[in-house]
Amino acid sequence: MARSIKKGPFIEKSLYQKVLASSGKEKRVVIKTYSRASTIIPEMVSLTISVYNGKSFIPVYITEDLVGHKLGEFSPTRIFRGHAKSDKKGRK
């Protein structure tokens, strides 16, 4: 179910303050956050935000195409290593 329009997009307050503070600076700094549920807003475009996936921070460069998505979508938490190989092929 989508979020109500009257509520607006969710973004953590501390993350929003960091985004506003870094948007005025010429030097781009990487913003670290644990908030995977925060929505990407237009003010974040051209910033690099490191999102925590439970083990490490994954840097995400924000472009216009990512606006409206959640930060957690671009920081996978699980690693697929492939299915177990069966030994039945060689046996007969």
Swiss-Prot record:
**PROSITE patterns noted in UniProt:** RIBOSOMAL_S19 (PS00323)
Which terms are listed as keywords in the entry? Ribonucleoprotein, Ribosomal protein, RNA-binding, rRNA-binding
Checking SUPFAM superfamilies in the record gives: Ribosomal protein S19
Q: Name one GO molecular function term.
A: rRNA binding
Name of one Pfam family that matches: Ribosomal_S19
Tell me one GO biological process term. Answer: ribosomal small subunit assembly
InterPro entries assigned = Ribosomal_uS19 (IPR002222), Ribosomal_uS19_bac-type (IPR005732), Ribosomal_uS19_CS (IPR020934), Ribosomal_uS19_SF (IPR023575)
Report the GO terms under cellular component.
cytoplasm; small ribosomal subunit
Task: Give the family per the record.
Answer: Belongs to the universal ribosomal protein uS19 family.
HAMAP family, sorted: Ribosomal_uS19
* Protein name as annotated: Small ribosomal subunit protein uS19
Its source organism is Borrelia recurrentis (strain A1)
Annotated gene: rpsS
